[in-house]
Amino acid sequence: MSQLTHITERGEAHMVDASAKADTVREARASAYVTMARATLAMILDGQHHKGDVFATARIAGIQAAKRTWELIPLCHPLMLSKVEVQLTAETEQHWVRIDAVCRLTGKTGVEMEALTAASVAALTIYDMCKAVQKDMFIGPVRLLAKSGGKSGDFTGDEV
């Protein structure tokens, strides 16, 4: 079984020293869902929200969050991301919005936390923009779908 990399032998939290790692292309893909009432989703899709374009705002928030993950999550490295993509898809049958985030770089550490943060903050932004019309929206699941590159190898999770 793998060991926790952010904990020393004495049980102290520390930032991993990545200086000896090789630069490789690393990519991660994460998703999040926001389930809401059909009327709330229709309002978003019809462009009738008084705060403006919900999807555009959530996309920008997700991109910005990925770039600032190191400021939000202790022990994350600041990264020079080469790509952050946030896609929002309304699935009217399930009355949810699916958020897919992809982060990529060439570097020494992975971008899983950046992809997860992008998807999460995009979901939170949708909630924030729509809470005036519906407070019981549901966020989740939020999960890592895939990662590639790096010493630990590739990972692909099952689709929800």
Curated annotation (Swiss-Prot):
**Enzyme Commission designation:** 4.6.1.17
Its UniProt pathway annotation is: Cofactor biosynthesis; molybdopterin biosynthesis
Q: Which UniProt keywords apply?
A: Lyase, Molybdenum cofactor biosynthesis
Where does the record place the catalytic residues? D128
Question: Which Gene Ontology BP annotations are present?
Answer: Mo-molybdopterin cofactor biosynthetic process
Catalytic reaction(s) noted = (8S)-3',8-cyclo-7,8-dihydroguanosine 5'-triphosphate = cyclic pyranopterin phosphate + diphosphate
List all disulphide bridges recorded for this chain. Answer: none
Q: Where does substrate bind?
A: L75, C76, H77, M113, E114
Stored InterPro entries? MoaC, MoaC_bact/euk, MoaC_sf, MoCo_biosynth_MoaA/MoaC, Mopterin_CF_biosynth-C_dom
Which molecular function term from Gene Ontology is one that the record holds?
cyclic pyranopterin monophosphate synthase activity
One Pfam family it belongs to:
MoaC
Functional note: Catalyzes the conversion of (8S)-3',8-cyclo-7,8-dihydroguanosine 5'-triphosphate to cyclic pyranopterin monophosphate (cPMP).
**PANTHER family (UniProt xref):** MOLYBDOPTERIN COFACTOR SYNTHESIS PROTEIN A
How this chain assembles, per its entry, is: Homohexamer; trimer of dimers.
Regarding protein family, the annotation reads: Belongs to the MoaC family.
Protein name per the record: Cyclic pyranopterin monophosphate synthase
The species this protein belongs to is Sodalis glossinidius (strain morsitans)
Lineage, opening ranks: Bacteria, Pseudomonadati, Pseudomonadota, Gammaproteobacteria, Enterobacterales
Q: Which gene encodes it?
A: moaC
